[in-house]
UniProtKB/Swiss-Prot annotation:
One of its GO terms (biological process) is response to tellurium ion. Keywords: Plasmid, Tellurium resistance. Belongs to the kla operon, which is associated with cryptic tellurite resistance, and IncW plasmid fertility inhibition. This is Protein KlaA.
Length: 257
């Protein structure tokens, strides 16, 4: 607040008097980051698609988990299915699905790192544009106060025909700066929303990858290596399977809303 007060004092005491002393420079007052540029910057960042790519990868994992349900290989085959080799076929499909899931999970970890890089870039952009909003607000407030406190500044002299109207041009400039500030505020809001969604998805995925995935891998490995599968083992594997699927599905909730 102290820095902004000093800035306001400088604007009203130095910058604005000089501006009205040389009205040709009114158009340069408050020049800074263009609002369209800020939106393009956000658009370009999101077009790299790290957040969308992670969401897509998680969706693929959830879909593939349906093929790796441990209860499928735990079902007792009929004599006819045994004769046709369906039991072995189910085990092979389960092993293939598990291997595919391992690959997808590893790929998702790589995409998650890209999301972290995106978040760092978003943080830098947020800092820049929040500072720009504060700067524009100071310029607008200083300009309005200056006009109120100096009613003769830039006004036409009585009885003199003047084609240039500095006071009107400056008032119009302040209105344009207010529009620009609103554009920056909209960009900041969009960045914060995008960031919040990405952080939530990344946090959920990271927690899942560090806690539930190792448990799931442990149980599925036990199923494909044991020669004596029992109901308790299958139940634990199914529990880990459902917990992983539920957690990954929840990580997509903020993005899909």
């Amino acid at each position: 607040m102290e820095e902004q007060s000093v800035n306001m004092a400088r604007l009203k005491g130095e910058v604005l008097p000089a501006l009205f002393a040389s009205p040709a420079t009114i158009g340069e007052y408050g020049a800074g980051i263009d609002g369209a540029d800020s939106l393009n910057e956000l658009s370009n960042l999101m077009e790299h698609g790290a957040v969308a790519a992670l969401a897509d990868k998680i969706s693929q994992i959830v879909a593939k988990l349906a093929d790796a349900d441990p209860r499928k290989i735990a079902e007792k085959p009929t004599w006819f299915e045994k004769m046709l080799g369906r039991e072995v076929e189910r085990q092979v499909r389960y092993q293939v699905a598990r291997k595919t899931l391992d690959q997808l999970l590893d790929e998702a970890e790589g995409v998650a790192q890209r999301v972290r890089d995106t978040l760092r870039a978003l943080d830098d952009m947020l800092n820049t544009h929040e500072a720009e909003v504060d700067r524009l607000r100071a310029y607008i407030q200083a300009g309005r106060e200056f006009l109120d406190e100096n009613p003769e500044a830039g006004a036409a002299k009585a009885g003199v025909i003047e084609f240039d109207k500095p006071r009107e041009r400056f008032a119009r400039k302040l209105a344009n700066l207010a529009t620009l500030m609103a554009s920056h505020e909209m960009s900041v809001t969009q960045m914060k929303l995008t960031r919040a969604q990405a952080v939530d998805m990344l946090d959920r995925f990271s927690e899942t990858a560090s806690v539930l995935v190792p448990v799931w891998r442990q149980h599925t490995l036990a199923l494909i290596t044991t020669k004596n599968m029992n109901p308790a083992m299958v139940a634990e594997a199914a529990k880990a399977h459902q917990a992983l699927m539920r957690s990954l599905s929840q990580s997509l909730e903020g993005i899909n809303q």
